[in-house]
Amino acid sequence: FALLSLPLLVGFTFPTVTLDSQTVSAKGYYFPLSEGTDKAIQASEGTSSQFLKPDTSRFYSQAAHENIIRKSADKYLAQSSIVINDENYLEVMEAIYDFPNEFEGKEIEFIGFVYNDPNHTNSQFVFRFGIMHCIADSGVFGLLTTGNTNQYENNTWVRVKGKISNHYHKELNQVLPTLEVQSFIKVDKPENPYVYKEF
């Protein structure tokens, strides 16, 4: 009886914890794979640690993936303004990172939590934790923001709206799509803070 009741006791006694900025600080954010990731182990296990840019390429052939991402990008590029929600979050982010020049100047809006990068004064990332296929393929995805006048603390949930521009990120040694903020409003944490990729 004690053995069977232990999981129930633990489940009701310990609080539920969600991933947040503390997790980002502990794991770091890198592009496209986390630093120190053993790619040979990933290949043998079929898993990957993803940060900033969702990457679904390993789930399709190269031609199929290129076709899917191109269609996805075209669908959102045809919109005058893109509202990113829980259902399309990973799809839109992957399209933005795959075609940053085409999305430059595009207005987008989405909800995420704030992460203050100690290396970027007056710049904040807005992230969501996402799951691509299973928990082994999870990561933190979002955009660097600039121009916001309100500097929120880590883990503050915000609705951010602005236009995509491309800026060089010194630590990652590459150009990243960046959101030039038009509005940055504090919101309540969503009931489900995670986003998922539907295949």
What name fits each language-model region?
Residues F1-F199:
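OB-fold and OB-like single-stranded nucleic-acid-recognition modules
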